[in-house]
Amino acid sequence: LKGVLILTLVLSLLGAEVTAGSEVPLKQAPSSEAGDEDLYPVLKLNSLIERANKENHEIVMAKARIESSRYRIPQEGALPDPMVMIGYENEGWNRYTYGEMPGSRWMVSASQTFPWPGKLSLQKKASTKESEAVYELYEKTRLSVIEELKIRYYELYYAWKGLDIIEEKLKLFELIEEIASKRYSSGMASLGDLTMAQTERYMALQERIMLRQKIESLQAMINSLISRDPTLPLGRPEELIPERIEINQESLKNSIEDSPDIKEKKGLLEAKDLKYQKARLEYYPDITLTGTISLKPDPYEDMWGLTVTLNIPLFYRSKQRMAILERSSERDEAYHELEGTRQMVASRILDLLSMIKASEELMELYKKTFIPKAEQSLEANISSYRAGRIELVQVIKALNSLLDYKLMYWFQVAERQKALASLERLIGRPLSSLNEGNR
């Protein structure tokens, strides 16, 4: 509607005649072929997110890592495999003497090693914590993919809005060029006016080519994120209704610990601490029980035996002590990594909140101040041009300013949506849930 009003204003005040039925298309798809509206249906963000959750290769791989980490948990808590030994002792060197000599016998033994109490349980708990960290890494990966998908979606939305404005601009300068040409032919305008109008139209054509290429590039990126052939066409993003969003600061502050980035680091720190505790138990020996049966022929009695074997940590200075120091260093590293992530998330949240606030203020400024003022300026310049007080170049500058302000407005709309997407990824949930939790 705005484009139609601007077009009518330019035509009427420049003195051009608007022929009946000559409507101006304000929205066009990158392809100039007929039937574009059928080729480019409405593209819904929720549908893209749903497909990405199911088909995106990074998400599928991260989900597979969860399964593999869970399979490792029972392995870490299992006892070592038992050992079975079958042997024979012969009395004498020259011949097989079983049944002839009392010392000849067949032997069967079985042994089982039991780690010192607490070792296996700590090992299993550490593996469980690592699996939980892998799950949080999956959530982090999934949310990162969705964040990138949203960012590309809103960039595509802005590119389409830019194409709308360029198409509007192109149509206006085609009409201005036609009017300038008629005025030049009748001696009412200079050649400079005609040249200026032509130059602006050619620049608009160049911008349209670049925007169409940008749209195709963004469509390929989105297709890649949803595991779709990059060459397949996508629809046009559905229309946004820019509204100011109230973010509960207290709820946002409390939700920092729910960030998948922080929860992943927490799980890794807990796993490192459990491994450190397990390393301290390595000073204690493992116990191996062995039972043996010796089979002798008649009239000799069979024999049995039971032994207990302990491993002695004799070289603890270079082995067990070094292992404890190693695990302690890993735990310290994980702790500082967690604290660094906390600070990074908190800092990034403040940065995004600042970006959102700035974008909303600029949107308000463009919508209520710059664009209305630019429309008034355009109207005044056109009136002055008709009266012969200014050159056409002043009208063109005023028109360009108005269209540029409209473009910057939609740029801020897209930037705000992109910042909101990044904020939701950081806290791991929709912003709407923050306000719901305080009702």
Model-derived regions: residue spans:
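Bacterial N-terminal signal peptides
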Residues: 4-14
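Acidic, low-complexity, intrinsically disordered peripheral segments
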Residues: 6, 19-38, 408-439
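Periplasmic alpha-helical coiled-coil/stalk elements that build and connect Gram-negative outer-membrane
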Residues: 18, 141-258, 352-355, 359, ...
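Bacterial Sec-pathway N-terminal export signals of envelope proteins
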Residues: 18-88, 113-114, 230-273, 339-342, ...
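Small/polar, glycine/serine/threonine/aspartate-rich low-complexity segments that form flexible
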Residues: 32-41, 85-119, 123, 235-246, ...
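A glycine-/polar-enriched beta->alpha junction
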Residues: 50-60, 67-82, 100, 108-125, ...
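Amphipathic alpha-helical coiled-coil segments
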Residues: 61-73, 141, 145-166, 175, ...
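Short, charged, amphipathic alpha-helical segments
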Residues: 124-128, 191-199, 392-400
